[in-house]
Regions:
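Metal-coordinating catalytic core of metallo-dependent amide/deamination hydrolases
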Residues: 1-55
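Active-site-adjacent C-terminal substructures of enzyme catalytic domains
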Residues: 43-44, 53-111
Length: 111
């Protein structure tokens, strides 16, 4: 993805976000974006596991993302992978509230 490299060279980007949900982008699509950002030396963040357990936490960890945002449906393996990779879980309670999400993230698991 030449655009990421160009933006990095111009000093116009400090991180790249990807959104991994079945109604948004697949893990394969997000993986391409995360790899391109890493190749350009740009830190990454992932929005995932908000609406379902789509493996967003594990994907974020596998690519060394700074954060995985939302995490309402993150499973134990994803949480462990993030802990090992140093990827921080960012909880966004206002997003859950406004989307009327009834599932709450397992805060104890994510600590």
């Amino acid at each position: 993805m030449p655009l990421i490299s160009l933006l990095q060279e111009e000093g116009l980007v400090d991180a790249v976000d990807a959104a991994c949900e079945r109604v948004l982008f697949t893990s394969e699509q997000c993986g391409r974006v995360l790899r391109a950002a890493a190749a350009a030396g740009v830190p990454t963040r992932l929005h995932g596991d908000q609406l379902s357990d789509g493996g967003g936490a594990a994907l974020a960890a596998a690519h060394g993302a700074l954060t995985c945002d939302h995490c309402e449906h993150t499973n134990d393996a994803g949480a462990r992978a993030m802990a090992e990779a140093g990827t921080v879980a960012v909880l966004l309670p206002a997003a859950s509230y406004f989307s009327q999400e009834t599932v709450r993230p397992d805060v104890a698991m994510l600590r």
